[in-house]
């Protein structure tokens, strides 16, 4: 199995640069601060099943908080970013582990037992709230929630990658190459779409919810479906082509 490596070199410089870009964007759009919310867990209708959590990419730009729903980051020009790190005292679900110093040292970390611990942050100033959690829509005025001009500026800034981001992309490409090679071997062995997908995930130690995109694993005529989402568990008798 491919070993996943944690990229730490250059992270402090990355956060400093992200802070600089946010400060410029906030000043240009007339905001005093920004509150970036990770997002919340969503439950399916009339069920107790929670959809896999996907963190707000604007927060992921700052810190590796892939599984940290209901955390939030307060960004003010000239100040250390304040991270409300949601870590509930829970026995029903496994809460996030304590923050690791290699990244947490760049923030003022506020440990939070309640999901709305951030609520009073930035209330007496012009604050932009960034995220799609239901709690934001309920508690924040529409003019402050996801201001499009500010988001457009940040989108543009994110197109220019820091050295840290480039290193992370290189690591992702390395893992992707391992997984693609494992999938190709599965195809040549005559495995089904489902089995090829499992081979892909096992080769790099990931589960579906951790993949950056829903895997398209298509054999034969399924290649023609642009975003083919099924994974047949029975391999065709005659396997002619493979799309990953």
Task: For each feature predicted by the language model, list its residue ranges.
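Active-site pocket-lining segments that scaffold enzyme catalytic pockets across diverse folds
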Residues: 161-213
């Amino acid at each position: 199995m491919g070993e996943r490596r944690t990229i730490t070199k250059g992270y402090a410089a990355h956060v400093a640069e992200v802070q600089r870009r946010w400060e410029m964007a906030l000043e240009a759009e007339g905001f005093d601060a920004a509150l970036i919310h990770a997002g919340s867990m969503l439950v399916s209708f009339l069920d107790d099943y929670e959809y896999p959590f996907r963190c707000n990419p604007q927060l992921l730009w700052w810190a590796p908080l892939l599984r940290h729903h209901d955390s939030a980051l307060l960004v003010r020009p000239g100040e250390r970013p304040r991270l409300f790190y949601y870590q509930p005292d829970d026995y029903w679900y496994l809460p996030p582990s304590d923050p690791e110093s290699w990244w947490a040292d760049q923030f003022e970390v506020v440990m939070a037992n309640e999901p709305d611990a951030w609520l009073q942050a930035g209330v007496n100033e012009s604050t932009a709230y960034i995220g799609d959690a239901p709690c934001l829509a309920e508690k924040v005025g529409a003019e402050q929630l996801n201001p499009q001009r500010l988001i457009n500026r940040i989108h543009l800034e994110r197109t220019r990658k820091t050295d840290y981001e480039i290193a992370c992309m290189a690591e992702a490409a390395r893992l992707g190459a391992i997984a693609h090679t494992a999938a190709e071997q599965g195809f040549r062995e005559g495995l089904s779409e489902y089995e090829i997908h499992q081979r892909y995930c096992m080769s790099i130690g990931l589960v579906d919810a951790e993949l950056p995109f829903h895997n398209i694993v298509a054999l034969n005529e399924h290649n023609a479906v642009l975003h083919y989402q099924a994974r047949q568990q029975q391999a065709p008798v005659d396997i002619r082509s493979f799309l990953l």
